[in-house]
Amino acid sequence: MSEKDKLTQSIFEMYQEYPFPDINYKMDYSLPLIRFLNDNAEKGKKNLLDGANVLEAGCGTGNTIIKLAETCPTGNFTGVDMTVNSLKIAKKNSDIKNLKNLNFQEQNILNLDLGKKFNIIFCIGVLHHLADMQKGMQSLVSHLEDDGYLIMWLYGKDGRFKLNLNQRMLSVLFQNENSLKKKVELTKKILRNESNKYLDCHFNVPESKIEDKWEEAVSYTH
């Protein structure tokens, strides 16, 4: 197994143990996304989702795709993820809302095979975790209609500079600790006793979300 494959596997195992995001996770990109969907709608349609086939690749626990399906009942929505435990939560939350226009499938983006194309594909904070980022992109594009929209969000080297420093600091502190569960417990303890002065850039998040900050992603700079 290559180093990139090992990193991707470790991320998969982490999300299996700590499904993300939790139900109360705040989506900072919501307003810009809604504005884009509304501004680019065809004449006579409420937004781009109206009557569209929509895919979220790497949907996790389904927060984004559930909210979109709930907002636009005329669209047909599909969420895929390789993390079974996250999908269980997504399906449960979708069933609670009785969403008939949304389905979930266990799929790996690198081997994506849905047998159809989509008008809109969302891939939010996922592609950079893959062992082969280019193959992942090609897989998404192959499922996109010729006039479709691919909406992505990726890590950036400069934008995550302080967060990366936080990760490195904790990696040094916990270099002799192999248990992810123990690392999370120690991190929570640090967060309870230190201020934002030392732990900055979205690292001082509620404890329910701290697990996501342990991801050692496959890093690319563009």
Each language-model region and where it sits:
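Conserved small/polar residues in nucleotide/adenosyl-binding loops
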Residues: 221-222
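Conserved SAM/SAH-binding beta-strand->alpha-helix loop
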Residues: 83
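Conserved alpha-helix/loop element of class I SAM-dependent methyltransferases that forms part
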Residues: 17, 27-51
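Conserved class I S-adenosyl-L-methionine
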Residues: 149-197
